[in-house]
Swiss-Prot record:
Pfam families tied to this protein: SDF
Gene3D superfamilies for this protein: Sodium:dicarboxylate symporter (1.10.3860.10)
Primary localization class, coarse: membrane
Protein name as it appears in the record: Neutral amino acid transporter A
UniProt-recorded Gene Ontology molecular function terms: amino acid transmembrane transporter activity; chloride channel activity; L-alanine transmembrane transporter activity; L-aspartate transmembrane transporter activity; L-cystine transmembrane transporter activity; L-glutamine transmembrane transporter activity; L-hydroxyproline transmembrane transporter activity; L-proline transmembrane transporter activity
Membrane topology listed for this record: Multi-pass membrane protein
Source organism of the structure: Homo sapiens (Human)
GO cellular component, one term: centrosome
Biased composition (Polar residues): 1-10
Tissue distribution of the protein: Expressed mostly in brain, muscle, and pancreas but detected in all tissues examined.
Extracellular side: 140-216
Reactions catalysed according to its record: L-threonine(in) + Na(+)(in) = L-threonine(out) + Na(+)(out); L-serine(in) + Na(+)(in) = L-serine(out) + Na(+)(out); L-cysteine(in) + Na(+)(in) = L-cysteine(out) + Na(+)(out); L-alanine(in) + Na(+)(in) = L-alanine(out) + Na(+)(out)
Length: 532
């Protein structure tokens, strides 16, 4: 407790008296020492933000040199190394953190927190989708852009649009990936449905083409299957009791060692971010044409991210916790800068875990349980730009969306964002699912791909912000439930009535008045019964 003459632990300058000297907090030396301490504590945040700004300046300076594609590849090499290191650490981090987190929580607490997390993810994603559809109808990003061609955007290597997939096959793939047939293969490959067109000639001379779905394996970690397996394994180890303690300690130790590796990698993040941002700016052919051609679509998407990330999510956090959400977000500047540069929720996961535990004091059991799940299934930012893109393409093709199609966009965007990969441009692949669901063509997807490198940055920031605020809400609710349980336990202890008879019989200070007699063995018998 502070004394009356103290403020934040320091003596007031008016009453400091002879204790004030060159090193006192009120002097220039004290202020310099506090400033140096602040810079030392926030060094990683300042370096990361500086890396983003330096990368933008580097890219702007090198654009006039007309670098070849080979030279741009060399320029991006330090950033590529950062992405490889972050992806290398994802597998042990996700599996170990979920196993240790699930094993450290009892079944009732795990079920309660899991239910709250699912409700939070569903609520925020659905609200993000509704906000995006409303903004798209207000701003009308597709009006006046009907004559726009992808070749006009100066992006030669945008590639072909993804093959459209049936909506039912997309959800079946989601279920298949939840239960991988081989855990080792799930670490680097994902199940995906492809199609084979079979031509059949009937006896009447009619030719029919049938599209048959076939199962394939594509490159990419099946994070959904690994998350589910790790959760179930943690619960099973908790169920084993003492027999599973050794394996739980193993996963805890491996998790702590992984976090040490993360802390080392984080010091390379500013360098990698600088070259990632710089190489991407150099790579673009004509940014001015790109922004002016699709400016309304970019504006609608980023405005949706700003409203959802700056108003909706903080408001939800405040309603549940009654705390300042922006003070909570201030401790997460480094993960936000990493998300902005890497465009990957999965690559931001190590940084987010480290900062949310050290800077914001979130319980490790909560953060290591909810953040890996959130990085996989909670995609608020992706839902926003997917809905805006769907309405944008509908307006490009002069299609008036009815109420049924709008409802389909909301539901499909909310559901498909669960299976969206937490990698750069992963959300673009799910736009084809939405377009197929409402009956729109997919030949305009290259326009979305052309500006995805811009929109995907704010998309990833909103994705990881939603995960972080969700962890903060769960931490607050868990603390509240713990305090309530301790208070109820204290009330039970106060109201308990001591057993005076038992205390009298078992106290070594009590001398019985009639120790001898025919009933001398009775106290011994009663004592034995009380032990049993």
């Amino acid at each position: 407790m502070e004394k009356s003459n103290e403020t934040n632990g320091y003596l007031d300058s008016a009453q400091a008296g002879p204790a004030a000297g060159p090193g006192a907090p009120g002097t220039a030396a004290g202020r310099a020492r506090r400033c140096a301490g602040f810079l030392r504590r926030q060094a990683l945040v300042l370096l990361t933000v500086s890396g983003v700004l330096a990368g933008a300046g580097l890219g702007a300076a090198l654009r006039g040199l007309s670098l070849s594609r080979t030279q741009v590849t060399y320029l991006a090499f330090p950033g590529e190394m950062l992405l490889r290191m972050l992806r290398m650490i994802i597998l042990p981090l996700v599996v170990c953190s979920l196993v240790s987190g699930a094993a450290s929580l009892d079944a009732s607490c795990l079920g309660r927190l899991g239910g709250i997390a699912v409700a939070y993810f569903g609520l925020t994603t659905l609200s993000a989708s509704a906000l995006a559809v409303a903004l798209a109808f207000i701003i009308k990003p597709g009006s006046g852009a009907q004559t726009l061609q992808s070749s006009d955007l100066g992006l030669e290597d945008s590639g072909p649009p993804p093959v459209p997939k049936e909506t039912v096959d997309s959800f079946l793939d989601l279920a298949r990936n939840l239960f991988p047939s081989n855990l080792v293969v799930a670490a680097f490959r994902t199940y995906a449905t492809d199609y084979k067109v079979v031509t059949q000639n009937s006896s009447s001379g009619n030719v029919t083409h049938e599209k048959i779905p076939i199962g394939t394996e594509i490159e990419g970690m099946n994070i959904l299957g690994l998350v589910l397996f790790a959760l179930v394994l943690g619960v099973a180890l908790k169920k084993l009791g003492s027999e599973g303690e050794d394996l739980i300690r193993f996963f805890n130790s491996l998790n702590e060692a992984t976090m040490v590796l993360v802390s080392w990698i984080m010091w390379y993040v500013p360098v990698g971010i600088m070259f990632l941002v710089g190489s991407k700016i150099v790579e673009m052919k004509d940014i001015i044409v790109l922004v002016t051609s699709l400016g309304k679509y970019i504006f609608a998407s980023i405005l949706g991210h700003v409203i959802h990330g700056g108003i909706v999510l903080p408001l939800i956090y405040f309603v549940f916790t009654r705390k300042n959400p922006f003070r909570f977000l201030l401790g997460l500047l480094a993960p936000f800068a990493t998300a902005f540069a890497t465009c990957s929720s999965s690559a931001t996961l190590p940084s987010m875990m480290k900062c949310i535990e050290e800077n914001n004091g979130v319980d490790k059991r909560i953060s290591r349980f909810i953040l890996p799940i959130g990085a996989t299934v909670n995609m608020d930012g992706a839902a926003i730009f997917q809905c805006v893109a769907a309405v944008f393409i509908a307006q490009l093709n002069n299609v008036e969306l009815n109420a049924g199609q709008i409802f389909t966009i909301l539901v499909t965007a909310t559901a498909s964002s669960v299976g969206a990969a937490g990698v750069p441009a992963g959300g673009v692949l799910t736009i084809a699912i939405i377009l197929e669901a409402i009956g729109l063509p997919t030949h305009d997807l290259p326009l979305i791909l052309a500006v995805d490198w811009i929109v995907d940055r704010t998309t990833t920031v909103v994705n990881v912000e939603g995960d972080a605020l969700g962890a903060g809400i769960l931490h607050h609710l868990n603390q509240k439930a713990t305090k309530k349980g301790e208070q109820e336990l204290a009330e039970v202890k106060v109201e308990a009535i001591p057993n005076c008879k038992s205390e009298e019989e078992t106290s070594p200070l009590v001398t019985h008045q009639n120790p001898a007699g025919p009933v001398a063995s009775a106290p011994e018998l009663e004592s034995k019964e009380s032990v049993l």
